[in-house]
Design a protein with these regions (language model features):
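Active-site loop segments of alpha/beta catalytic cores
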Residues: 1-51, 63, 68, 75-83, ...
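A contiguous, low-structure linker/loop signature
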Residues: 83-114
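A diffuse structural propensity rather than consistent per-protein peaks
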Residues: 114-115, 315
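Conserved small/polar residues in nucleotide/adenosyl-binding loops
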Residues: 367-372
Length: 379
């Protein structure tokens, strides 16, 4: 790669440390452009003529993302990655869900013809769109930045997008055996889809993920089950945990998105998944964001369980107290940055903790996975 990020090697080293529960990453979700010197003279495309072009025209999006990354700050560990997301849980659209472009996001509506059959159609237009979008972005990137993996999602969340949340919750009682079978079918399709998209976006073995703008030296994914706020611990261990575990066993680097205080009771089941590398915490509506002292004990519990953490929307005034309380190893900070002055302030704060964070050599880590993979690894 001839990347626009001049310190990419240092950032990759910090990511490898973090996957191995060491050190600090200073990043942010998405990017900002305020007072940023462009990395290249990339003109902005003409404004999208409508929402359909804004989201579903691969060439327009590739041109827009090329301009976007070229004009975004890449200081600290902010990654050069094009966000190719096609809505949260776009695997559901690949399986028949209906796309609707909004002003700020893409909605995926249930398939009106869904009949409980989980079928992958390689000719489905939504699947073709995924591939065409990533190929267009990869060609436009020209090695200057990563093309991110879309937010596919998995499991119950995908099924809920296909048929509706209420129906999935009823299935846990009315047809649990069928539901288990569907979870395995979705996982099997997930791996097929993931592998094909990975082969489009990969840089060597490396890749980046759109959600949380993250990087890994091999295959990585963000996993979740937002519907789990509405199910019991027993149901989680039956309908979620086994399939998350399979993903963690087959994908080298995995981050679980734990969303909302209503999902916290599933943390013990997550910590039981030995192969899971890290957990991201989203407090949810009405709660303080990830840098709040309210979550210190949660982060400590995750770290003590052998997982790295990702804290999101941390503000500058929260940064030092957070690190003082939870330590400086295995901590990924998704900061609430608005300009490069704030990034530089945060870098100075984090530098104070670098000596207390154990160094791990890149060469060693590339060959010693934090969660040993057996021969079933998809690397």
């Amino acid at each position: 790669m001839e990347t626009w990020k001049t310190n990419l090697d240092e950032t990759k080293k910090r990511y490898i440390d973090w996957w191995n529960h060491k050190g600090i990453i200073l990043n942010m979700w998405e990017h900002f452009q305020e007072d940023v010197k462009p990395h290249a003279d990339i003109p902005a495309p003409s404004p999208a003529k409508d929402l359909n072009q804004k989201w579903f025209d691969p060439q327009w999006r590739a041109e827009y993302l090329d301009w976007y990354v070229a004009h975004s700050s890449l200081k600290a560990d902010i990654l050069p990655v094009a966000n190719t997301q096609l809505g949260p849980g776009s695997l559901a659209a690949i399986l028949g869900g209906v796309f609707e472009g909004g002003e700020d996001t893409i909605w995926i509506h249930p398939d009106p013809d869904f009949n409980d059959e989980i079928v992958f159609n390689p000719e489905h237009p939504n699947w073709i769109l995924h591939k065409e979008l990533l190929k267009a972005c990869k060609a436009k990137a020209n090695g200057h930045y990563y093309v991110g993996m879309p937010d596919l999602m998995e499991g119950l969340d995908v099924l809920a997008a296909l048929k509706g949340t209420d129906k999935v919750l009823l299935d846990t009682v009315m047809q649990p055996e069928v539901l288990e079978q569907q979870m395995q079918q979705i996982n099997d399709i997930y791996f097929k889809v993931f592998d094909e998209l990975y082969d489009i976006i990969r840089e060597g073995d490396e890749m980046a993920f759109c959600y949380f703008s993250s990087w890994a030296p091999g295959k990585m994914s963000k996993l979740q089950s937002d519907i789990s706020t509405m199910i019991s611990e027993d149901d989680y261990r039956r309908f979620v945990q086994p399939f998350i575990r399979e993903q963690c066993q087959k994908i080298d680097y995995t981050l679980y998105h734990l969303d909302g205080v209503g999902a916290m009771h599933h943390l013990p089941a997550l910590l039981e998944i030995e192969e899971l590398n890290a957990i991201q915490w989203t407090p949810g509506v009405g709660e303080p964001q990830g840098g709040s002292p309210k979550w210190y004990d949660l982060y400590k519990k995750i770290l003590a369980g052998g997982k790295s953490i990702m804290a999101c929307w941390v503000t500058l005034d929260e940064l030092k107290p957070l690190l003082d309380n939870i330590g400086a190893d295995g901590v990924h900070l998704e900061m609430d940055f608005h300009n490069e002055r704030e990034v530089e302030q945060a870098m100075r704060i984090v530098e104070e903790y670098s000596s207390s964070s154990s160094d791990v050599s890149k060469d060693c880590l590339l060959y010693t996975s934090p969660s040993p993979r057996d021969s079933t690894s998809s690397r």
